[in-house]
Amino acid sequence: MPALEVRGLKKSFGSLVVLKDISLSIQEGEVVSVIGPSGSGKSTLARCICRLEEIDKGEVLLRGERIDNGKHSNRDIALLVGMIFQQFNLFPHLSVMENITLSPIRILDVPPPEAKERALSLLKRVGMIDKKDARPSELSGGQCQRVAIARALAMNPRILLFDEPTSALDPELVGEVLEVIADLAGTGMTMMIITHEMLFAKDVSDRVLFMDEGGIVEQGPPSELFTAPKMPRTRLFLQRMLATVGKELIQAP
């Protein structure tokens, strides 16, 4: 049974069609990266999966159960899906520790001592234990994103969705966040990563999806999609990316 399955998903904003009949599945423990130009529908797809956007048509199933039909509460969704956003979305008036423990205590009814113990373990995992009492304003963008990842993990979700987690970061801070995500990938966490970091997607993914104009144009193992794409649109996109990341992108491992 797939960890995540999307069937015939369609989404429009007024007359603008954003997602056109999207179907995909992600297996337990699989890491899938979603690449493509800006405006291709990648972020909207993630928001529809975790029900931040209502879909117009189609189905979204997590571990075989539909979550698009209104029968599941936000608490149910939080138990299944964790989402990491571009802008961190940390509460500015709360400490790092409070940001991580708030949802487990309020939504999952986890006793505060247990929530704090779990938070300390996660902060150690993402290299932020020394900042547990800091406010977000005292942290760099990379540090805020690592806290956001720990916060998502604190809910013990079945799958993590990353919506361009490094796009708002200073280039010098990107590596520290990618290192944390790569570590999670190595633990068998099921993940869908929307990213413009092509080399990272090539290295960490089991499978890569290329999206354009609201549809999935091509998908496959990174060793195939990056080195021998079948579709002309995929080839054009990757050729343009070569100017940024160089020949390393298309070299076979």
Feature-to-residue mapping (PLM):
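ABC-family P-loop ATPase nucleotide-binding domain
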Residues: 1-10, 245-253
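ABC family nucleotide-binding domain
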Residues: 2-222
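C-terminal boundary and immediately downstream tail of ABC-type ATPase nucleotide-binding domains
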Residues: 212, 223-253
